């Protein structure tokens, strides 16, 4: 019965949602027509009740009948001391600088980061309730952005709380310096007594560093036992932190663990637009789409690519078209990632440039002599130089098969009669095609 219920739920949610929200989900018990589900923490419990109530309700009714009901419980971690309430003390201010651009408003939410985003936002709104929060994911996926967004949100909305953002390297260096100077007690006072929300970035830096791990373990315990919020970021999940003390890894896992996945193409496009908005810049939609499609390894590189295009535009005074963007971003794009421009589309672009006739007019029904000549040159070069089929040429130039045959014949006859001006234009078009091919 348990497996039937789980399978029924699984058929009603997509794979990504199942992995994000149901990884700790299980049927705890079935008592008559009542199903008790169990999840890993309060955040997931509340999220499932809010977003998936109808899914769960329908699933249990299908298996157990229309009178079936359900409830969701979660396994709460018992802290070392009797203190278990969310953080309520309010004191001073921000103890370390935060990047003001890292806010929840500037974070673009997509399928791959939705869970981590909402978890971080809930932690910011309710410090101490979901504790600790452990966010992990690859380089440049937004871990630091979320981490500092928590800090910025708390500073804006709970100005009396003391917020500290540090990298694990800074934690290590502070520990070493305090030991050299005989100020270990001051170090512990700083990190255990004088902070209400501790945000630790790049914890994987402490792999193999047993001494500092021990100090972090005791710092963690004291903060957690006092109901103080801890948020940790890493490039890998807790159980893959090799050479980390098991007791510390277990502490990381006892709260909320959220993964950041690489954004899909649509999310990258939204992120690219947000970056343009922040930089007060503009780029053509086709250029923005090209960047989102091809610069996909991490968001830092995506931002770097956009900044490069904006700087080029500002310093040269030129608009950035697709061809220019491809050339400018060669170093940002993995080999063979750029989708090759369709040969005839590129040919039409070149013919437009050489003849001075806009692409739209070449493809229109205009009988203007210049447009007619440009159109015929394009079809002739496509047939005799690119070796394209008549059917393909007809489709690309929006013409019938007989019109293409007639246009190619007219250009050929004119060349045989010694039309030097026409030959010069064709040679220039072919020369530009060759130049582009050689430049990659």
Curated annotation (Swiss-Prot):
PANTHER family with a match to the protein in the record: CHROMOSOMAL REPLICATION INITIATOR PROTEIN DNAA
Region feature Domain II, mapped onto this chain? 69-96
Q: Which organism is it from?
A: Thermotoga maritima (strain ATCC 43589 / DSM 3109 / JCM 10099 / NBRC 100826 / MSB8)
- Can you state the subunit structure given in the record? Oligomerizes as a right-handed, spiral filament on DNA at oriC.
- This chain belongs to which protein, by name? Chromosomal replication initiator protein DnaA
The family classification in the record reads: Belongs to the DnaA family.
Q: Where is this region: Domain III, AAA+ region?
A: 97-313
Q: Which GO terms describe its molecular function?
A: ATP binding; ATP hydrolysis activity; DNA replication origin binding; lipid binding
- Taxonomic classification: Bacteria, Thermotogati, Thermotogota, Thermotogae, Thermotogales
One cellular component term from this protein's GO annotations in UniProt: cytoplasm
Query: Know anything about its domains from the record?
Result: Domain I is involved in oligomerization and binding regulators, domain II is flexibile and of varying length in different bacteria, domain III forms the AAA+ region, while domain IV binds dsDNA.
| Residues that bind ADP | 108, 113, 140-145, 300
Instruction: Name a single GO biological process.
Output: DNA replication
Q: Where is this region: Domain IV, binds dsDNA?
A: 314-440
